[in-house]
Amino acid sequence: MATVRLPDGKELEVGSGERLEDVARRIGPRLARDAVVARLNGRLVDLDLPVDGGGELEFVTADSPEGLYVLRHSTAHAMAQAILELYPGSKLTIGPPVDDGFYYDIEVNGRISEEDLPRIEEKMREIARRDLPVRREEVSKEEARRLYRDNPYKLELIDEIPDERVSIYRQGDFFDLCRGPHVPSTGRLGAFKLQSVAGAYWRGDENNPMLTRIYGTAWPTEKQLRAYLKRLEEARARDHRRLGRELGLFTFAPEDVGPGIPLFLPKGETLRHLMEGFVREVQTRHGYQHVWTGHLVNERLYARSGHLEHYRDAMFPPMRDGEVSYRLKPMNCPSHMTLFNSRPRSYRELPVRYAEFATLYRYEKSGELSGLTRVRSLTQDDAHVFCTEEQVQEEFARALAIIREVLDAYGFTDYRVRLSLRDPEGGKYIADEEKWGRAEGALRAALDAAGIDYEPAPGEAAFYGPKADFMARDVLGREWQLSTIQVDFIQPGRLGCEYVGEDGERHTPVLLHRAVTGTTERFMAVLIEHYAGAFPVWLSPVQAVVIPVADRHLEYARRVREELSEGGLRVEVDDSPNSMQKKIRENARQKTPYLLIVGDREEEAGTVNVRRRGEGKRQTEMGLRGFLERVRGEVAARR
C-alpha cells in the first residue's frame, strides 16, 4: 500500500499496482472522464502509470494549459498516424505542440497540399473513433534503432539521446519516439482542425532535406474550436501584410532589393517617424541622450564583446578591406560601449544613458522571414545605461516608467513579465558564474522592488545576461514580446569600460540594455493588427482628407488643406476624377480618421462638413479653427 496526497489535502490509500486512472475513477466519474494526465510528485505522467511510490498527486484536465499542451501533442500523433495510413512509406521527424496548436514535419511519400487536409482530418476522426489505447514503452536504444532502421531522421534523434533507454508511444499499429505524456486513448482527442501546409528544412537548416510541415489546432470542445477559428478569421482580416499593402504603408521587392528588406512608402515612413518620435520624446524626458553609430563595425569589436562567437550565424558575411574585416551591424551595444570609452569617466557622471534608433542587419533564414515581424533590415529602439551596481534598481524603475507610458498610450495594458534566465546546461552563454549570479540577483531585486510579478524562463536569457521580457496582449488576446530590460555584468569588462570611483580606483560599470518597442518594423506590424489599420488620430499618417463636392470646389479644398497643414495637421485633398460618393468610400477604406466635405455652402461660410471614422454618415459642420483645435486636443491626449 502507498499513500497519495491530493491538492485539497485529502489522503488516499492506493494498492500495489493500482494505476492513476483507477485512482481518478475512485475519486469520481467526472474526473475520470476529464483527466488527460496527472502530476505525480511534480512530474507530468501518463494515467496508466502505477502509483507504487505514492506522493503528491494532482490530476490535469484538458482545459488547463498543461492539459491542453498534452491534448495537442496527442493530436499531432493522431495526424502522423493518419498520414502513415494514407501515405505509406512516409517518414516522420518531429511533431511538437506550439502556441494554439501543433505541427508535424514529415518526409511524405507523395505530395500533400491543402486540398488533402479534409481527407487527413477524416482519417484522424476515424482513429479517434477507434478509441485506441495510448501506451508508453521503454526500449533500449538498440531496439529503437531497429524500429527506425529505415528512418534517418529518427535515428539521428536516437543517437542524441544520452540515456541508454528511450520511450516509444504506441496506439494500435502506430508508434512514435516521444517523451510524452499523452492522453489515455485516441477517443479523448477532443476537437481539431488541420490548417495549412508548408515546407520546412530538417532542423531549420537550409542544407538539409525539405520536409512537409502540416499545421493544426486542437481544443477540448467544438465550441472552443469554433471560437478560436473565429478569432483566426478576425486575425486574417487584420493581417499587417495585407493591410500594409492596401493602406500604402510598405512593400517588398525580394527580386530587386532582397528578401526580408521592407521598403516604406510615404505613409509608412510617416508612421515610423511618429512611432519613433514618441519614444524619443519620452526617453529624452527621462534623461536619455540620443546617439548615432552608423552601419559598419570592425569585426574585431564583436570578437572582443563575444558576439562573434555566440551570434555569428545571425550576422551577414564579412566585408574585407585589406587586413580588416567589417560586419553590417547586428546590434548596438558594442558601439555604445565604444562611445562610453571615448573619454575618461567619473562616478559623478553615472548613470550615462545612450539611446539610438539604429538600422541593424540580421541574416534571418529565408524560410523564417515573415512580413514585418521577421526581417533582415530592422530598426531597433535601443538604449544602454552605464551605471553602478547600486543604481541598477533606480535605473530599472526609470526604464519601466518609459515602457509603461509608451505601451499604455498604445492600449497595451494587459502584459506579463517573463524573467529570462540562463540554462546552466546550455552552451550558448558566456561562462562566468559569479557575474551571472550577480546579474540575476540584481534583476530579481529590481523586479521585486518595482512590485512586478514575473515568471522565470530558464534558457531564454541573452548570451551575456538575464532579461525581463514584457509580453503584451493585443485586442485579439494574442501575446507579443515587446519591451525588454537586460542586466549585463559581462560585456563592459570585456570591452574595457571603466570609471573612476569615489575611492579613486577604477571600476567596471553595470550595463542595462533596454528596448521599449523592440524593432520599429515588428512593432508597426503589431500596431497595424492591433488597430486593424484604423490608427488613432495622433498616429494616423493622414489625419484628414478634404473632399470637394465638385471640381469648382477644388480651390477652396486646397485652401482648407493649407490652413489645417499650417496648424500642424496631416491633411490631403482628394482631387481624383471620381464622384464625391466614390471618394468618400475610397477614403473610408483607407481608414482616414476625418473626411471633410466641402461644397458651395461650406465655401461661402468658411467651414467644413466633418464625417468622423466609425460614425457612419453622420456629419457635423465646423469652422476650420474649431476643427483644428478638436484634432489638436486628440493628438495631445494621444487619442
Curated annotation (Swiss-Prot):
GO terms for MF: ATP binding; metal ion binding; threonine-tRNA ligase activity; tRNA binding
Catalytic activity from the UniProt record: tRNA(Thr) + L-threonine + ATP = L-threonyl-tRNA(Thr) + AMP + diphosphate + H(+)
Protein name: Threonine--tRNA ligase
Described purpose of this protein according to its UniProt entry: Catalyzes the attachment of threonine to tRNA(Thr) in a two-step reaction: L-threonine is first activated by ATP to form Thr-AMP and then transferred to the acceptor end of tRNA(Thr). Also edits incorrectly charged L-seryl-tRNA(Thr).
Similarity comment text for this entry: Belongs to the class-II aminoacyl-tRNA synthetase family.
InterPro entries hit by this protein: aa-tRNA-synt_IIb (IPR002314), aa-tRNA-synth_II (IPR006195), aa-tRNA-synth_II/BPL/LPL (IPR045864), Anticodon-bd (IPR004154), Anticodon-bd_dom_sf (IPR036621), Beta-grasp_dom_sf (IPR012675), TGS (IPR004095), TGS-like (IPR012676)
Disulfide bonds: none
UniProt: Zn(2+) binding residues: 333, 384, 513
